[in-house]
Design a protein with these regions (language model features):
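Bacterial N-terminal signal peptides
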Residues: 1-9
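Sec/Tat signal peptide C-region and signal peptidase I cleavage site
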Residues: 12-16
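Kelch-like beta-propeller repeat domains
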Residues: 17-420
Length: 420
């Protein structure tokens, strides 16, 4: 029978003053030497209090990306108990937390960049990417007894998809954009998890050319005052990636979708808006605070994406001189220190009434892309940032945890009779 230490009392969001928090560092699973180097595009959630699940992801374990290393995809599913270690660190005033990880199973195949959402005590996973290409799989991950787990299939996606944004409204999972059959798409799918035997439904596509690396969240607690129903918030940034007759550009755009009316509303981000420099491509959202963070700097990433596009075209035309030039530029781009890339570390929200973004005061992490962020609505902690990239091609195994519940009197011990 497992013991869990539960934090009780008030909880705070990203607007709370940073000095009110205690911050701890931990590591993602270190049981495999390649996975131990850190991954991005992984799956993670807290399916029981104080018990993390982490699965899949990808990295360059043998040789860095800037030196032409091969990307490796992972299928391992790990669980880790962290809450007792946080309690101990609070008592000893330590800054590091030792999470006890176990390997409990494998995904149906090595997977990165899948859409996933925590749904009660389950993780819903859809699509993703493997070394062989994009995936159609959809399934439920659920923990069992004695470090066991089950994977229950859901209806397969209509076509292979990866890199989608996702969000839940009540029992319905939404998949927004991503790559469909290898090409960026603005299509949207939904699946009613209360009736999973049904097939995926097509929703209204978002009204924009396809974005790369969207970020989405549900405004469950901030319903649209005009309709009184929850809606999806979506942030997009990079377009023109696949279109042969267009250049890549950062067209940072905030969009909302109300499933009840099947309608989108688009808000163009002005160049002087504080969020225009970010775009949050590869970033993450906090549903509890309706805010965005993380991801790449817009101007630098546009140049890198255009270079990749030009390199592909030069190879197709057999222009060796241009290929050599672009490859040299690409290596130079990947050789800077992490700080140079300016991954976003602050939190921003979008005020629909003013049509502008605004910075939110309070706690911020180091900037990362393709990481997993758990807020207080999905974790016993006030915030947790897991893995991801610190610069293009470079992953980190670091987990950053912050909490306001560091007074030992705010913890109590309960038992989970179903977990041994």
């Amino acid at each position: 029978m497992a013991l869990f230490l539960l934090a009780v009392g008030g909880s705070y969001g990203t607007s709370q003053a940073q000095e009110d928090y205690r911050m701890f560092e931990a590591k993602t699973p270190q049981l495999d030497s390649a996975y131990a180097k850190g991954v991005s595009g992984h799956i993670a959630g807290e399916l029981r209090p104080g018990l993390l699940v982490m699965a899949g992801g990808c990295n360059f374990p043998d040789r860095p990306a800037r030196k032409g290393g091969a990307k490796r995809y992972y299928s391992e599913i790990y669980i880790g108990e962290y809450l007792g270690a946080v309690h101990h660190a609070c008592e000893t005033k330590a800054s590091e937390v030792d999470i006890w990880w176990w390997l409990i199973g494998h995904l149906p195949q090595p997977t990165a960049y899948a859409a996933f959402q925590q749904y009660d005590d389950q993780l819903i996973v859809a699509g993703g990417q493997s070394a062989e290409g994009d995936l159609r799989d959809a399934y439920i991950i659920q923990l069992g007894n004695r470090h066991g787990m089950t994977i229950t299939p859901l209806p397969s996606l209509p076509e292979p998809r990866s890199g989608m944004a996702s969000a839940l409204i009540e029992n319905v999972l939404y998949l927004i954009g991503g790559r469909v059959n290898g090409k960026l798409s603005n299509t949207v799918l939904s699946l009613d998890l209360s009736r999973p035997q049904k097939e995926w439904c097509e929703e209204t596509p978002y009204p924009h050319s396809p974005f790369l690396k969207l970020v989405a969240m549900t405004n469950q607690d901030e319903s649209d005052t005009s309709s009184g129903v929850p809606y999806l918030s979506v942030m997009g940034s990079f377009t023109g990636v696949d279109e042969p007759d267009q250049g890549v550009q950062a067209d940072v755009t905030y969009m909302t979708y109300t499933p009840q009316t099947k309608q989108w509303q688009t808000y163009k981000i002005a160049p002087d808006d504080p969020i225009a420099a970010h775009g949050f491509g590869g970033g993450y959202a906090s549903g509890g605070e309706a805010s965005f963070s993380g991801g790449v700097r817009a101007d630098l990433f546009v140049t890198a994406l255009q270079r990749e596009k030009d390199l592909k075209a030069a190879k197709a035309k057999g222009n060796r001189r241009l290929v050599k030039k672009l490859q040299a530029e690409q290596r130079a781009y990947l050789s800077h220190d992490p700080a140079w890339y300016g991954f976003c570390s602050d939190w921003y929200s979008f005020d629909k009434s003013r049509g502008r973004g605004e910075a939110k005061s309070g706690f911020h992490f180091d900037g990362r892309a393709d990481a997993v962020y758990l807020d207080r609505s999905s974790s016993m902690m006030d915030g947790m940032l897991i893995g991801g990239e610190t610069m293009p091609g470079v992953r980190t195994p670091r987990i950053v945890i912050f909490t306001t519940a560091c007074n030992p009197r705010k913890f109590h011990v309960t038992t989970d009779p179903n977990y041994q």
